[in-house]
């Protein structure tokens, strides 16, 4: 029930659009936890402010710490990516969004504490 509530709430908050690209194909957007699900308490798991709506590519990059969202909602890409990959796709898909801001949700703004957790414990420096 909590997962269903979380997913529906995050999709609604972002109006079904990836907060990075604006892409809205339902099968390609994922309600991603900012603070990872496995370390959340029960209330954090269901809290839509602990969510970003991301397309599948950015969901995976975010979960793996290859990118993060700073408290001012700016996207930052890991030095791991910057220093290790210089192919065109990496430049376009990851480095191309660095420094841009995510599209703000109409409600349930990303929780600053959850963003801080991701920045400190998930993001690869």
Model-based region annotation:
Residues 1-22:
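Internal active-site segments that recognize and position negatively charged phosphoryl groups
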């Amino acid at each position: 029930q909590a997962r269903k509530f979380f997913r529906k709430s995050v999709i609604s908050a972002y109006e079904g659009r990836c907060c990075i690209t604006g892409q809205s194909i339902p099968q390609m957007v994922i309600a991603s936890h900012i603070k990872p699900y496995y370390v959340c308490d029960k209330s954090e798991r269901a809290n839509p402010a602990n969510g970003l709506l991301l397309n599948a590519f950015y969901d995976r990059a975010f979960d793996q710490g290859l990118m993060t969202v700073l408290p001012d909602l700016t996207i930052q890409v890991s030095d791991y990516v910057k220093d290790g990959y210089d192919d065109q796709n990496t430049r376009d898909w990851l480095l191309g969004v660095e420094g841009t801001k995510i599209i703000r949700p109409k409600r349930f703004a990303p929780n600053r504490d959850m963003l801080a957790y991701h920045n400190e414990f998930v993001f690869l420096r």
